[in-house]
Amino acid sequence: MIRDLVIVGSGPAGYTAAIYASRAQLNPVQYEGSVTAGGALMTTTEVENFPGFVDGVMGPVLMEDMRKQAARFGTELITDDVVEMDLKGDIKTIKDGSGNVVQARAVILAMGSAYKKIGLVNEDRLSGRGVSWCATCDGFFFRDQTIAVVGGGDSAVEEATFLTKFASKVVLIHRRD
């Protein structure tokens, strides 16, 4: 059976696409991944900049609610990884880690992004506890502190500039000499 739509990814963009597609009666299939559905917000303690949550909401709670909403409208949720895609032609082919193949007329890729880690000791352990990858999301928590931004491109300079609104001092560290 050829499906109307396959969505790859289970962060806010993936679930939002699933909710809208289901309500439009496109009967979407959504691949959530085999490890943890919900994307990067699953490791975020409190989300304070999501509309509608005046007092904030825990990242995992928000993502579970989005997942339930997508399912309620009829999205077929598959907890597996996509290992192969052929997106050429009118019919797209998606193969998952279990060897199942789904064909669809359209595919939405909503896999999010991965932050580039710098390899510091305890970097993973301190994520969300002083180590951050999002100035807009977390700058507020570092008011009147010295903040270091690691990077040398436009994004690093942009983040450092934004953080001057909160920090007592911003240090920009470039990776290369």
Which residue ranges define each predicted feature?
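Glycine-rich beta-alpha-beta "Rossmann" dinucleotide-binding loop(s) and their flanking helix/strand
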Residues: 98, 107, 111-134
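N-terminal Rossmann-like dinucleotide/flavin-binding domain of flavoprotein oxidoreductases
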Residues: 42-101
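Glycine/Thr-rich phosphate-binding loops of Rossmann-like dinucleotide-binding domains
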Residues: 16, 38, 117-118, 158
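Core beta-strand elements of the Rossmann-like FAD/NAD(P) dinucleotide-binding domain
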Residues: 1-3, 96-106
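N-terminal glycine-rich anion-binding loops that anchor highly charged ligand groups
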Residues: 30-43
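Rossmann-like dinucleotide/flavin-binding elements
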Residues: 2, 7-33, 127, 133-177
